[in-house]
Amino acid sequence: MNISIISIGKLKEKYLKQGIAEYLKRLSAYAKVEVIELPDEKAPENLSEAEMLIVKEKEGIRILDKISDDTHVIALAIEGKQKSSEEFAVSLDRLATYGKSKVAFVIGGSLGLSSEVIKRSNESLSFSKMTLPHQLMRLVLLEQVYRAFRINRGEPYHK
């Protein structure tokens, strides 16, 4: 399985970079995983609704440029479906079973994802109803993907 994590914004925090590197190393035994980091759109603090839409649309174009037609796209969004680790593992296993060798998880910038990215997505996933920093979501997502592979193979780790 080829997994892409497509995210908006440059990761600056060393501790997040270290955690991501660790999970990418662990995941290399199970799948080819790449993190695609796209630049965020510079925007002032107090944006109007129209300006927010423009920012999301520009970031959305960058995201869509990285997704091929044969990729199963999972958008990370607060309004997405919440799953347990076991349910998530089953979802990934089903994708592999039914020939979806390319999977892309999409993490938007601080304003979220454009409507075009949501439309292109095959499903939407939420890790919480709480708002989480999009930089932190990369690490949380990679940990859950790793956990899913361990669950699916019956290997110790998941508790």
Swiss-Prot record:
<keyword id="KW-0808">Transferase</keyword>
<protein>
    <recommendedName>
        <fullName>Ribosomal RNA large subunit methyltransferase H</fullName>
        <ecNumber>2.1.1.177</ecNumber>
    </recommendedName>
</protein>
<comment type="subunit">
    <text>Homodimer.</text>
</comment>
<keyword id="KW-0963">Cytoplasm</keyword>
<keyword id="KW-0698">rRNA processing</keyword>
<feature type="binding site">
    <location>
        <position position="76"/>
    </location>
    <ligand>
        <name>S-adenosyl-L-methionine</name>
    </ligand>
</feature>
<keyword id="KW-0949">S-adenosyl-L-methionine</keyword>
<dbReference type="GO" id="GO:0070038">
    <property type="term" value="F:rRNA (pseudouridine-N3-)-methyltransferase activity"/>
</dbReference>
<dbReference type="InterPro" id="IPR029026">
    <property type="entry name" value="tRNA_m1G_MTases_N"/>
</dbReference>
<dbReference type="Pfam" id="PF02590">
    <property type="entry name" value="SPOUT_MTase"/>
</dbReference>
<dbReference type="InterPro" id="IPR003742">
    <property type="entry name" value="RlmH-like"/>
</dbReference>
<keyword id="KW-0489">Methyltransferase</keyword>
<comment type="function">
    <text>Specifically methylates the pseudouridine at position 1915 (m3Psi1915) in 23S rRNA.</text>
</comment>
<feature type="binding site">
    <location>
        <begin position="127"/>
        <end position="132"/>
    </location>
    <ligand>
        <name>S-adenosyl-L-methionine</name>
    </ligand>
</feature>
<comment type="similarity">
    <text>Belongs to the RNA methyltransferase RlmH family.</text>
</comment>
<dbReference type="GO" id="GO:0005737">
    <property type="term" value="C:cytoplasm"/>
</dbReference>
<dbReference type="InterPro" id="IPR029028">
    <property type="entry name" value="Alpha/beta_knot_MTases"/>
</dbReference>
<feature type="binding site">
    <location>
        <position position="108"/>
    </location>
    <ligand>
        <name>S-adenosyl-L-methionine</name>
    </ligand>
</feature>
